[in-house]
């Protein structure tokens, strides 16, 4: 018993140790061990196994505790009689059930087989079993409390002790397996979590990187019209519209459709930023530098709703004028400069403004002290004008300049001759040597296209033509051709259509550009402007000296050669004509100058270059090169012009419509040859006329100054020649290009890279009006051609309109002679009409009569008339009846008036060496006509080469119509003095004052 007890005590110790360990590891094991101890009573019978078995079991337990989770080799130490149970236990464990009773039963049966000879112990075991059975429920519920009861039992059964190690082994295995699995699961989960966290972090990093990439910004710098710079940061892939909107928001500008952003692609090429495309794609590798400019010049700035919009337009025009892109006459420079001072400085104050140095302001490309004095003098007369009113007056005068709103592009015709293509609100203009030689109104253009570096326009056939003609031009490169094409598409859409045209639907494998203007049209813009409802925005006007940064600084004589250098795509195209020449263009109604009322209606054939060139030389081969000409034409007083603005358009139209049949008078008959040529109006005839005139006048480098007083007409010699020249140019119809242009029409458009067929949807039927107007102009030139200098200019007016010649001068003179003496009423009417037409803004060249007329400043009294031969004969005059038919004499009637003439001639004893002999080679010839209320001035400029020496001859004829007597001597002296003042570098060779008095009616001497 002692041995048994000792072994049992050892087993208890081991079991208690195992139980403690198990309890530490997991509380559930303790409950399971206690349940095993309270098993069936049969287990106690086997509580006395052989000592060897007990020692083996204790060893097994010890080894089991020491072993790691890899306890798979433990079966080697288990006796054979336990192996089955082990496997069974494992199965049960695997099943995961807590069924330990079957295992205990197996152990008990085996023990009973071996322990049969101990009946007493069996009885004791049974008793204990009964007691244990009673406590079974309590053991399950109170696991922790059973622990002490089990340890206090006096005779625990050996079977119970032996079974504990086996169950513990299996449980430990199960636990270890579970732990291993859990560890693996936890490890896997941890790994997954780690991976997920890492993945999320990586994704977050990538996302943040992407975000930074998407939000990567580029700094943009935009130079504004007042010279300041606006900077902003834009997303790299932002479209042009984003930047444009930011700039307009910064400027507080709502009427923004007239403006755009320019970027410099090359030193000579500027492009408009397309708002519908990404900026990055358009700039490529260029810096993000832009300039804010006017893209579409409003034909009538007075229709703009807000003052701030007009202010920005003023700033743009000041830049254009100061840089030479918008040529002006001296008087126009002075007048516009005075309005600039009034807008920026306010009313003239002797104390405050007397000491201001006007040289700080830039009014013209080449500013002289004389101009500054004139500006200051005119500034005093604007007292009371608010800045907004001054800006409005500035725009009213500037809009009539011939080059207003013209975008010039370099090109060559089919013969390789350098020309310029100008795009404006009315159509496409063709210039050669700074003279406008043709005009294609939008209604006459059927299709615009480009292929590689060629640009084509398909023109609607004329009345007598059966087929359409295509005219081609060669541009410097493909990009220049595409740029010109896009500008044409945009201008046509903006000015002529009611709404933008939708781009063509993409077709499979189609060629050509799909570009279409996507912004608002002028009609839509005006409609939107009427909806603007906000207080007038406050803005500060800046000094005009900012314009000086774009100046050429070229001398007046050379100015025209490079004035356009900084103009996008038109470098050196236009020169700012000498201070006085520009005004001619102002009168041009059609092309360069837009009528306030119906900008698109005029067929205009005038020169755009026209300030100086306003003169149009007829012949295809004769073009005026005025780089060395320094003639200064003064514009008609602006006040007078403004008074007639309201009725100018009507008068012009009426004047053009009336086409009186010209009849030659006595004096004209003597000069039949030139007249006949003039009548023809063709380019060939023009050439002949020019040659004839050249023979008659060119040889001498002299200046003939004739002053005609009281309706006297001066020698027609120079006049007719001038008229003829102009007329040939007039003849060119807008439908036909100059010879070189038309010849290029043969090129085909089959594979045009870009194609655009303008839809002539005009807002109010302006197209029809324009077409009719053009047709009238075309027809008139022929009959009008017959008109002589002295004849009423009305008939000639129509040809002049196209030719832009000095015809007006003639008409005015004749008409006024008759009207002044015989029909005062008619005189005033006609005079007013002519004055309005010619001086419509002192810059506008009336298409009808004065294509080349420049306004004469009211101040300018130099009535210097160029005449090679002063006529002293009876003059037959034709009265021009206004469309209004106010005159008593019908336009078609040719009244013959008896007149008395008186001529005073002054000839300089020194005549230039080359004056007499060889006439030399005629290089250029120009005729400029300007008119004021009572004075008509015609200037003829010819440039010839004799023996390698270049000669410039200026003949100026001034006709003064009035009822009062004029001192001839004083007029002669004044003419000489003014001629010398205007051209100090030239000598006056001849001055003729011719007075013609109508005896029949007035009886004046």
Curated annotation (Swiss-Prot):
Task: Specify where it is mainly localized.
Answer: cytoplasm
Task: Report keywords, A-Z.
Answer: Acetylation, Actin-binding, Cell cycle, Cell division, Cell membrane, Cytoplasm, Cytoskeleton, Isopeptide bond, Membrane, Mitosis, Phosphoprotein, Transport, Ubl conjugation
Which GO molecular-function terms appear in the entry? actin binding; PH domain binding; spectrin binding; structural molecule activity
- What segment(s) does the record annotate as region Hydrophilic? 502-610
Question: For the modification Phosphothreonine, which residues carry it?
Answer: 89, 763
Query: Where are the annotated segments for Spectrin--actin-binding?
Result: 611-676
Domain FERM stretches? 218-499
PTM N-acetylthreonine: list the residues: 2
Modified residues annotated as Phosphotyrosine in this record? 623
Regions of compositional bias (Polar residues) in chain numbering: 675-686
Region annotation (Disordered) maps to 1-80, 93-196, 652-800
Here the segments flagged for biased composition (Basic and acidic residues) are: 22-31, 111-157, 169-196, 690-711, 754-770, 780-793
Cellular component terms (Gene Ontology): cell cortex; cell junction; cytoskeleton; cytosol; extracellular exosome; focal adhesion; nucleoplasm; plasma membrane
- Subcellular localization, as worded in the UniProt entry: Cytoplasm, Cytoskeleton; Cytoplasm, Cell cortex; Cell membrane
Q: Where is this cross-link: Glycyl lysine isopeptide (Lys-Gly) (interchain with G-Cter in SUMO2)?
A: 140, 144
Which biological process, per GO, is one annotated for this protein?
A: positive regulation of protein localization to cell cortex
Q: Where is this chain compositionally biased, Low complexity type?
A: 734-746
Record-linked SMART domains: B41, FA, FERM_C
Report the protein's function. Required for dynein-dynactin complex and NUMA1 recruitment at the mitotic cell cortex during anaphase.
Q: Which PANTHER family match?
A: 4.1 G PROTEIN, BAND 4.1-LIKE PROTEIN 2
Quaternary state and interactors = Interacts with FCGR1A. Interacts with TRPC4. Interacts (via CTD domain) with FKBP2. Interacts with NUMA1; this interaction is negatively regulated by CDK1 during metaphase and promotes anaphase-specific localization of NUMA1 in symmetrically dividing cells.
Q: What is this protein called?
A: Band 4.1-like protein 2
- Native source organism of the sequence: Homo sapiens
């Amino acid at each position: 018993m002692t041995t048994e007890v000792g072994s049992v005590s050892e087993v208890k110790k081991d079991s208690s140790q195992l139980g403690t360990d198990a309890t530490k590891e997991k509380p559930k094991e303790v409950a399971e061990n206690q349940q095993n101890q309270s098993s069936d009573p049969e287990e106690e019978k086997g509580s006395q196994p052989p000592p060897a078995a007990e020692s083996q079991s204790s060893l097994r337990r010890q080894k089991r505790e020491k072993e790691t989770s890899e306890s798979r080799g433990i079966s080697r130490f288990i006796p054979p009689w336990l192996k089955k149970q082990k496997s069974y236990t494992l199965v049960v464990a695997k099943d995961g059930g807590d069924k330990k009773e079957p295992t205990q039963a197996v152990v008990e049966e085996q023990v009973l087989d071996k322990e049969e000879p101990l009946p007493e112990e069996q009885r004791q075991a049974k008793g204990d079993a009964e007691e244990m059975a009673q406590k079974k429920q309590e053991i399950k519920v109170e696991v922790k409390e059973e622990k002490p009861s089990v340890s206090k039992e006096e005779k625990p059964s050996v079977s119970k002790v032996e079974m504990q190690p086996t169950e513990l082994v299996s449980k430990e295995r199960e636990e270890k397996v579970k732990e291993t699995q859990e560890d693996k699961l936890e490890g896997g989960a941890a790994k997954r979590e780690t991976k997920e966290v890492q993945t999320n972090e990586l994704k977050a990093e990538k996302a943040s990187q992407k975000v930074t990439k998407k939000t990567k910004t580029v700094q943009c710098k935009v130079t504004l019209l007042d010279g300041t710079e606006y900077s902003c940061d834009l997303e790299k892939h932002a479209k042009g519209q984003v930047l444009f909107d930011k700039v307009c928001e910064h400027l507080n500008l709502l009427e923004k459709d007239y403006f755009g952003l320019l970027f410099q692609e090359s030193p000579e090429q500027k492009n408009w930023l397309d708002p519908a495309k990404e900026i990055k794609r358009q700039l490529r590798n260029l810096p993000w530098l832009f300039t804010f400019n006017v893209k579409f010049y409003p034909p009538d700035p007075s229709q703009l709703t807000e003052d701030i919009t007009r202010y920005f337009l003023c700033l743009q025009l000041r830049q254009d004028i100061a840089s030479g892109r918008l040529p002006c006459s001296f008087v126009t420079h002075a007048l516009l400069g005075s309005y600039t001072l009034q807008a920026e400085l306010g009313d003239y104050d002797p104390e405050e403004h007397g000491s201001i140095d006007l040289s700080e302001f830039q009014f013209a490309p080449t500013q002289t002290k004389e101009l500054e004095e004139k500006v200051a003098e005119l500034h005093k007369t604007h007292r009371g004008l608010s800045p907004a009113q001054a800006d409005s007056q500035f725009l009213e005068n500037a809009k009539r300049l011939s080059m207003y709103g013209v975008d010039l592009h370099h090109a060559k015709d089919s013969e390789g001759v350098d020309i310029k293509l100008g795009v404006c609100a009315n159509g496409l203009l063709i210039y050669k040597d700074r003279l406008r030689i043709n005009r294609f109104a939008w209604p006459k253009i059927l299709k615009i296209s480009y292929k590689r570096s060629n640009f084509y326009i398909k023109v609607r056939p004329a009345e007598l033509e059966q087929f359409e003609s295509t005219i081609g031009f060669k541009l410097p490169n493909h990009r220049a051709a595409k740029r010109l094409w896009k500008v044409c598409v945009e201008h046509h859409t903006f000015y002529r259509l009611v709404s933008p045209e939708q781009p063509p639907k993409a077709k499979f494998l189609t060629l050509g550009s799909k570009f279409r203007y996507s912004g608002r049209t002028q009609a839509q813009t005006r409609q939107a402007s009427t909806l603007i409802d906000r207080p007038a925005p406050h803005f500060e006007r800046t000094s005009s000296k900012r314009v000086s940064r774009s100046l050429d600084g070229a001398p007046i004589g050379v100015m025209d050669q490079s004035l356009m250098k900084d103009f996008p795509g038109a470098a050196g195209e236009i020169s700012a004509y000498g201070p006085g020449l520009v005004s001619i263009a102002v009168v041009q109604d059609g092309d360069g100058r837009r009528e306030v009322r119906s900008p698109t209606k005029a067929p205009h054939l005038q020169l755009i270059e026209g300030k100086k060139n306003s003169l149009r030389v007829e012949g295809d081969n004769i073009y005026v090169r005025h780089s060395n000409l320094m003639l200064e034409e003064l514009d008609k007083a602006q006040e007078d012009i403004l008074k007639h603005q309201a009725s100018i358009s009507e008068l012009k139209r009426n004047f053009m419509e009336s086409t009186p049949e010209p009849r030659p008078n006595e004096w004209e008959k003597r000069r039949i040859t030139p007249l006949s040529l003039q009548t023809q109006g063709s380019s060939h005839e023009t050439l002949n006329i020019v040659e004839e005139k050249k023979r008659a006048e060119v040889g001498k480098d002299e200046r003939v100054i004739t002053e005609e007083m009281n309706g006297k007409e001066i020698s027609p010699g120079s006049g007719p020649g001038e008229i003829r020249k102009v007329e040939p140019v007039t003849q060119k119809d807008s439908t036909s290009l100059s010879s070189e242009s038309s010849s290029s029409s043969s090129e085909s458009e089959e594979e045009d890279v870009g194609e655009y067929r303008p839809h002539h949807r005009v807002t109010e039927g302006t197209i029809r009006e324009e077409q009719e107007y053009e047709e009238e102009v075309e027809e008139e030139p022929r009959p009008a051609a017959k008109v002589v200098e002295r004849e009423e200019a009305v008939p000639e007016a129509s040809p002049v309109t196209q030719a832009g010649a000095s015809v007006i001068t003639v008409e005015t003179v004749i008409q006024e002679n008759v009207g002044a003496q015989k029909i005062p009423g008619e005189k005033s009417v006609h005079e007013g009409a002519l004055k309005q037409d010619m001086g419509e803004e002192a810059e506008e060249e009336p298409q009808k009569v004065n294509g080349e007329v420049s306004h004469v400043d009211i101040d300018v009294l130099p009535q210097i008339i160029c005449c090679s031969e002063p006529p002293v004969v009876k003059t037959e005059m034709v009265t021009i009846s206004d469309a209004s038919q106010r005159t008593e004499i019908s336009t078609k009637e040719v009244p013959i008036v008896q007149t008395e003439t008186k001529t005073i001639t002054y000839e300089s004893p020194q005549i230039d060496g080359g004056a007499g002999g060889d006439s030399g080679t005629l290089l250029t010839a120009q005729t400029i006509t300007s008119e004021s209320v009572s004075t008509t001035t015609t200037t003829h400029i010819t440039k010839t080469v004799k023996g390698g020496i270049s000669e410039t001859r200026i003949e100026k004829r001034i006709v003064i119509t009035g009822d009062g007597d004029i001192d001839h001597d004083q007029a002669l002296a004044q003419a000489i003095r003014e001629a010398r003042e205007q051209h100090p570098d030239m000598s006056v060779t001849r001055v003729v004052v011719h007075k013609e008095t109508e005896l029949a009616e007035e009886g004046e001497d």
